[in-house]
C-alpha cells in the first residue's frame, strides 16, 4: 500500500482531543538502536485499542516518579533499569510535540499491538517508569508495511515533519496545556 496523502484539518476535529495518562514501559529498543528514532512505549488501554492503527500526533509531558530504581527484563531477554524518570532535566519536563504509532508494526512482525510515542526532543537518559500525559489531536496515516528499513525511517521523518507543521498552528497550540 502506498502512503496516502495527509490532510491536516485547521483545528482538531472529533473524536480529538483524546487525553491520556500512562507510564513509559520498555519495548524492544529498536526505535533508538535500529532506526535512530527513540520511542517511549506505553501500554495499550481500551481507549487506545479502539483507535485505528496508524500514526497520530499531539502533545505530551513527562513526569518523574519517586519510586526506587528497578531492573526488568525485556521480552528479548535484555535487562533494563526503570529509573522512573528521576534523571529527567527541566527541559525534558516541558510539554513537547509527539507522534505516536499504534499498531502491529508489520515491518517487525509484532504479535502484540503496540503504542509507541516518539517525543520530539533529545533526552540524555532513559526514563522507563516515568509518567506520561499526552493528547492525541489528529491522525496522519494508516500503518504501512515497508520493504526496507530506509523507507520506514523516511516515512517516520515525514510523519514528524507533518506533525510539527500541524502543531505549530495556533488552533493546535491551545492544546499544549496538559
Curated annotation (Swiss-Prot):
Active site: 116 (nucleophile)
Keyword Cell inner membrane: no
The protein's annotated pathway: Cofactor biosynthesis; FMN biosynthesis; FMN from riboflavin (ATP route): step 1/1
GO CC, any one term: mitochondrion
Domain of life according to the entry: Eukaryota
Pfam families: Flavokinase (PF01687)
Catalytic activity, reaction form: riboflavin + ATP = FMN + ADP + H(+)
SMART domains reported in the protein's UniProt record: Flavokinase
Cofactor info, note text: Zinc or magnesium.
Cofactor: Zn(2+); Mg(2+)
Single GO molecular function: riboflavin kinase activity
Assigned EC number: 2.7.1.26
Signal peptide: none
Keywords from the UniProt entry: ATP-binding, Flavoprotein, FMN, Kinase, Magnesium, Metal-binding, Nucleotide-binding, Transferase, Zinc
GO BP: any one term: riboflavin biosynthetic process
Residues engaged in binding Mg(2+): 39, 41
Family: Belongs to the flavokinase family.
Purpose: Catalyzes the phosphorylation of riboflavin (vitamin B2) to form flavin mononucleotide (FMN) coenzyme.
Name of the molecule in the record: Riboflavin kinase
Amino acid at each position: 500500500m502506498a502512503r496516502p496523502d495527509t490532510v491536516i484539518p485547521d483545528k482538531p476535529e472529533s473524536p480529538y482531543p483524546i487525553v491520556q495518562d500512562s507510564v513509559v514501559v520498555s519495548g524492544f529498543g529498536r526505535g533508538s538502536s535500529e532506526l535512530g528514532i527513540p520511542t517511549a512505549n506505553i501500554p495499550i488501554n481500551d481507549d487506545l485499542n479502539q483507535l485505528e492503527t496508524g500514526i497520530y500526533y499531539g502533545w505530551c509531558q513527562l513526569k518523574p516518579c519517586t519510586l526506587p530504581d528497578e531492573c526488568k527484563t525485556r521480552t528479548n531477554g535484555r535487562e533494563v533499569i526503570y529509573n522512573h524518570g528521576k534523571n529527567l532535566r527541566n527541559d525534558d519536563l516541558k510539554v513537547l510535540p509527539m507522534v505516536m504509532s499504534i499498531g502491529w508494526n508489520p515491518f517487525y512482525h509484532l504479535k502484540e499491538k503496540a503504542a509507541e510515542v516518539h517525543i520530539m526532543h533529545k533526552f540524555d537518559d532513559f526514563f522507563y517508569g516515568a509518567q506520561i500525559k499526552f493528547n492525541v489531536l489528529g491522525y496522519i496515516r494508516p500503518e504501512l508495511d515497508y520493504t526496507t528499513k530506509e523507507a520506514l525511517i523516511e516515512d517516520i521523518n515525514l510523519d514528524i515533519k507533518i506533525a510539527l507543521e500541524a502543531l505549530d498552528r495556533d488552533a493546535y497550540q491551545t492544546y499544549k496545556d496538559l
